[in-house]
Swiss-Prot record:
The keyword Transmembrane helix does not apply. The gene is nsa2. Keywords: Nucleus, Ribonucleoprotein, Ribosome biogenesis, rRNA processing. Component of the pre-66S ribosomal particle. Involved in the biogenesis of the 60S ribosomal subunit. May play a part in the quality control of pre-60S particles. A motif (Nuclear localization signal) lies at residues 11-18. This is Ribosome biogenesis protein NSA2 homolog.
Amino acid sequence: MPQGDHIELHQKRFGRRLDHYEKVRKKTARAAHKRSAIAQKVTGLKAKLYNKKRYSEKAEMKKTIAMHQERTNKKASDDKVKEGAVPAYLLDREGVSRAKVLSNMVKQKRKEKAGKWDVPLPKVRAISEDEMFKVVKSGKRQKKAWKRFVTKVTFVGEGFTRKPPKYERFIRPTGLRFKKAHVTHPELKSTFYLDILSVKKNPQSPTYTQLGVITKGTILEVNVSDLGLVTQTGKVVWGKMAQVTNNPENDGCINAVLLV
């Protein structure tokens, strides 16, 4: 028989360990993993009893959660609605409010913006993954096939460094890496050889955009500082969008039209 609550007495006198609450927190965090491990290992009658116990615990937990959620749940009130009552969202129906005018202005601006970025090639042919990538076999016995060789033109940027070849999933060959493009200004009817700053959007897939793959219809950002274009406030325009209009992998060069 126990001769006294000596543990509780010691805690009252000297307090707990400095890391006690941290240990308790970690123990509770590990509890779920421990339970899972036991449930996976246990077999036979023990498994049946354990599963029955967990089933009842979960049912109890669901009831408790439901009780707590009752406070936040919104229910339809039984009170009768008075005659002539108008809901809050219909209160401003009498006159056109300032908010509505602003909303219409915003919509109009969006329409203008959408029209502003009409592109020369609104639709392009879909490119299959087999056409875009070539499977590269690797490993001692050439049995691994997780590497891909990009067969289209790419842009990798100025400070690009390859990953170690052993771990590189997408191989972008040096011969298909381009840094410049022939960009035609639609209003000036003249072509300029400009630096590519980045690949903004490849219409095929976000993955290709991330890899910097350039296909027909891709939107590029090009350096137009040499053209001397200025904004309405007088600032020099540095980068502008252009859409690729040819198949660079076939032609060996990138032809694009500037989006003015």
